[in-house]
Amino acid sequence: MTKETIRVVICGDDGVGKTSLIVSLVKGQFIPNLQAVLPPVTIPRDFSSSPYSPKNTVLIDTDNSDPLAIQRELKNADVIWLVYSDKDSYERISLYWMITFRSLGLNIPVILCKNKCDQYTTNSPLEDFLDTKIEDEEFIPILMAFKEVDTCVKASAKTHFDVNQSFYLCQRSISYPISPLFDAKVGDLKPSAVAALSRIFFLSDEDQDGFLNDNEIMDLQRKCFGKSIDLNELNFIKHTLSDLTSSEEYPSEILYCQGKGLTKQGFIALNKIYTEKGRHETTWGILRAFNYTDSLSIDDAVLFPKVNVPEQASVELSSKGYRFLVDIFIKFDSDNDGALNDTELHTLFRSTPGLPNLWLETNFPASTVVNAKGFVTLQGWLAQWTMTTYLDYKITTAYLVYLGFQEDAKLAVQITKSRRMRRRQGRLYRSYVTDRKVFNCFVVGKRNSGKSSLLESFLGRLFSEAYSPTIRPRVAVNNVEVTGDKQYYLILQEFGEQEEAILQNPSRLAECDVLCLTYDSSDPESFSYLLELLTNNEIMKDIPVVFVALKADLDKQQQRCKFQPDEFTDTLYLDHPLHVSSTWSSSLNQLFKKIIQASLEPGKFTPGFPPDIKPTNIDYSSAVILGSSIGFLALFSYTMIKLLKPTQQ
């Protein structure tokens, strides 16, 4: 993006008027008999309304008698203002100056300025002064030979003609560089510029009909430039594109369609015209409004805004984030069936780098709620983004920007309070939770205990008898309604072959709100796996636990281990295992609600606390009200006694 300060080095042969140009710019008038070389002159941003103008511009005058000093200044320059005034100084542009710049390895723009234009007359002097077109016979050879020459301009320090314009062109070459946009050799916009403009067209096409109608053009104009487009200019754009349609340059492309609007190719052609005519600041105005940097990538500061997330806190979507995601879903659900099919999903993500890697890793859409055809529903769409935000909020902020979120992306997320800890019997345990709506549950158990079926049932899918062992981690996310119509989101994770390694990793366990310890109640060897895990991993006992006896629709078997499940949970002062079957929907609902309860009240589900010291939720507000009431009554009674006492005497 624009630098705070840019350095403009003015070069050229002796006598071309370098110093006079600087003085004419600063003083607004011609002053004769100047000193040979001026010290650096700093010009602040006080005349430009553009937010992309540099804060300060430093003009460096040069003395040709000290070539080493010139070289030092050139190596620190951001742009070169190269001045000539006659035939001899013009010839030295290509024979000396441009060769010198290249020998120094400079890769900065050069603004070529023909000074002292007041000395040249033609049959029409006014015409000569106003002729600043690039087709000038002196400029074209230079532009063709040296790609580093950004633009050319005629000026006169004596009459102050186009001195300000020359200075602006120096600033513009940095604030609105043409090199990222236009390939002079090919004579066309660069692919990266076409890609950026195509994305902007896509985001601006609100009704997704492939055209920018008048209202959409007006909205784009207001977003980019803060004002409505003039109707005459809009009609001129339409006529220009209509004339170009079927021209030699665009033989088979429709650029503008009467009654519909600009096509994507027409929008790109319009911006090509802007760059060819030296109006590329207009194109940059459009690009900058969509947060593109000079490298034509979206600014990282916009994609990944600084969000302060305290340790043991989590990140969730805010109401603005949810609202935007609902609107996006509705916008691209073109058949209004309440789900996004493959085509609609592909179209939705056209303005992004594609599906997030996290979604691919979690096997989206198998990770969330889909309809009978396997298409993600609105419920599943919101659940997937909820999980994404919880696991890696930076993915969410970046993709919301890609999808067209207009505000600061950090407004789409909110930070929960840090997890609080309390102490009982010398042990720390997690305090109750009041402000979180998203919880993370690790589903643990022996192979073939029914974990995968549990995840499938959580997403509302039909039970399958077929067994397929889980190798890679799996995840499922859905919303859960608890008593009082309160809605929470629950993430269930199954780890497959990585299970033991993850359970031995303190940092991974810290991410877990509840351990769902499952066993197959019809397999006598299943519960012993959990006993062994808890024996070998003491750290697991610091996390809230819910025991679950799966496959409860099958015959219950005595477990071949030291403790039976009910006995073991009694030793931990925990509830007996819930008996759950993937074919019993009521038991599933009971389990998911219990996991949410354990997340909200972790102290009650942490192993090892006897019932008499189980942490309870204290209604502090009631206590405060009660205490205040007692205090008020005491004060009132005391006051009345004091008032009545003299009367009694």
UniProtKB/Swiss-Prot annotation:
| Keyword Isomerase set for record | no
Checking Gene3D superfamilies in the record gives:
EF-hand (1.10.238.10), P-loop containing nucleotide triphosphate hydrolases (3.40.50.300)
- Give the family this protein belongs to, as stated in its UniProt record: Belongs to the mitochondrial Rho GTPase family.
Question: What's an example Gene Ontology biological process for this entry?
Answer: phospholipid homeostasis
| GO MF annotation terms | calcium ion binding; GTP binding; GTPase activity
Q: Which PROSITE patterns match?
A: EF_HAND_1, EF_HAND_2, MIRO
TM stretches of this protein: 624-644
Task: Give the keywords, sorted.
Answer: Calcium, GTP-binding, Hydrolase, Membrane, Metal-binding, Mitochondrion, Mitochondrion outer membrane, Nucleotide-binding, Repeat, Transmembrane, Transmembrane helix
Q: Is the keyword Coiled coil in the record?
A: no
User: Which residues take part in binding GTP 2?
Assistant: 445-452, 481-485, 550-553
Q: What is this protein called?
A: Mitochondrial Rho GTPase 1
